[in-house]
Amino acid sequence: MKRKKKIHTGVCITDERIVCVTAHVENKTMVITDALEMKRSAPIDEDIRKFIEMYDLDDGAYSIVANIDTQMHVAPYDPHDFDMKEFIKWNVEDYFSFDGDCFQMDACRREYPRHNYHMFMVAVERHSLELLKQGIRDTYAPVDVIDFWPIPICYSLMRRSGTVTGVVEKGNLHLWLWWNDICIQECRIPITSTDVSEGIEQLETRLQEFGVDEIQGIKLYGLEQLTEEERKDMEAIISIYGETEYIPLLFLGRGRNRCNQGQLDWDMAIGMAARGLKWIGLGW
C-alpha cells in the first residue's frame, strides 16, 4: 500500500499581506504545489480568519508566523541549580524591554561546549499574539505551530548554524546571527560598507564562542530599497562570505506561478512549511 504524502501549509503574516505555500516532501526535495496571498485590511484576528476561510485546506494543517513585536535573548545557566520560573522572574527585566505583563515568553535550551548550557528566550507582545490565536480559534482550523519572528527564515536555508540574516529597516540593517536555529546575537547598524563589515566581524567573533570558526553564509532582504551604491556595497559583502543557499525546493503549479522566493515573507512561509513537514535538521 502506497503511503500517503504528508502535506503542510506554511503561513506568514506581515502588516501588508498574508502569504502561504502548500508543500510536501518527495525524493529529499520540498515540493511547493500551491501559493496564495491576501492583502491586509483589518486587525490580525479578522484577517487570519478571512484568509483561512478563503484558503480552506483539503488536507494537512497550517503552521504560522506573524510579524509581531518580538525580543530574543540567550544566557548561560547552571542546570544543577536551576528553576525556570525563578530564572525568568529575576532576570526578565534585564533581558527584555516590554512593560509589565504585556508579553508572553517561551524558551528552549542548548548545550555547547559539553556541559555548558544556554537558555534561549523569546518574548512576544501579548495582545497581538492573543488576537492571532483568537482568529485561529474562530475558524477551528488545524494549526500545528505558531512560531516567532524571524526564526522561520532559518528553516528554509541549508545552513542554520553560522548563517547571518538581515533586513533593511528604516535606514538601518537589522542583522541576526544564527546557531542551531537560535539567535545568539542581533544588531542594527547603519547601511555603510564599513559599518556592516565591522558588524559582521563582531558577529563572527560571537559565533566562535559556539564552536563555529567563521560565518557560513549571509541572506539579506530589502536591498531593493537601497541606493545603487548601497546595494553594490552590500552585494560585495555577501560575495565575501557567500549567500546562504536554500534547502532543495521544487515549485509546481500555482506554487511556481505565485510564490516569490527571495522575498522575506514568502521565504518565511516556505520555512514554516518546512517546519510543519519536519523537514529541518535532516542533514541539510
Each model region followed by its residue ranges:
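Short glycine-rich phosphate-binding loop at a beta-alpha junction
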Residues: 56-70, 212-226
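Internal amphipathic helical hairpin motif
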Residues: 68-119
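Glycine-rich phosphate-binding/hydrolytic loop that grips phosphoryl groups
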Residues: 245-284
